[in-house]
């Protein structure tokens, strides 16, 4: 996939009309603050029930991994819940865990024959991952994963805040 298939928008990921939106989830999968809470709130109880079923069968989702559920009431029919790392100074494998969250989301989308995805800025909110570093990792990891998933036609980075939007726009222009 070439660079023109990556784009950035400033907005609300819960309104994206794509095949799947990615949720910056916590390992318990039961919703939280920020984008996680917004997605659970907008998608309704079907998302929470699907997450609870995953939690009951596999005990949640480890950091760097991803699981897929229904999109509930969202415009996107699926939600991929990716668990990014909490920033702990950068010497606890955070870079690779963040890259894996993006890579595993792409792999899961490809396995489910999805073509258009939207990502939030994973780990840059309450998890405090440095935004510039996270943007570099996210773009590189997505490009790497897309090389092995040619069926994916479009990836949109949906930035809720001005700083992330500026960082992604600079890197993708």
From Swiss-Prot:
Domain Macro: 1-173
Pfam families, sorted: Macro (PF01661)
Gene3D superfamilies, sorted: Leucine Aminopeptidase, subunit E, domain 1
PROSITE patterns xref list: MACRO (PS51154)
Family: Belongs to the MacroD-type family.
Protein name: Macro domain-containing protein in gbd 3'region
UniProt organism field: Cupriavidus necator (Alcaligenes eutrophus)
């Amino acid at each position: 996939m070439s660079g023109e298939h990556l784009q950035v928008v400033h907005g609300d990921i819960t309104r994206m009309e794509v095949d799947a939106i990615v949720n910056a989830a916590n390992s318990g999968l039961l919703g939280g603050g920020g984008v996680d809470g917004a997605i659970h709130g907008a998608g309704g109880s079907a998302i929470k029930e699907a997450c609870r079923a995953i939690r009951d069968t596999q005990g949640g989702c480890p950091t760097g991994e991803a699981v897929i559920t229904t999109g509930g009431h969202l415009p996107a029919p699926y939600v991929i819940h990716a668990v990014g790392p909490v920033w702990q100074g950068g010497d606890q494998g955070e870079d690779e865990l963040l890259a894996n969250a993006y890579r595993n989301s792409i792999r899961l989308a490809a396995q489910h024959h999805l073509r258009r995805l939207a990502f939030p800025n994973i780990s840059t909110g309450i998890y405090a991952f440095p935004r510039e570093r996270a943007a570099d990792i996210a773009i590189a990891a997505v490009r790497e994963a897309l090389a092995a998933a040619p069926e994916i036609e479009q990836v949109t980075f949906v930035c809720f805040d001005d700083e992330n939007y500026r960082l992604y726009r600079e890197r993708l222009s």
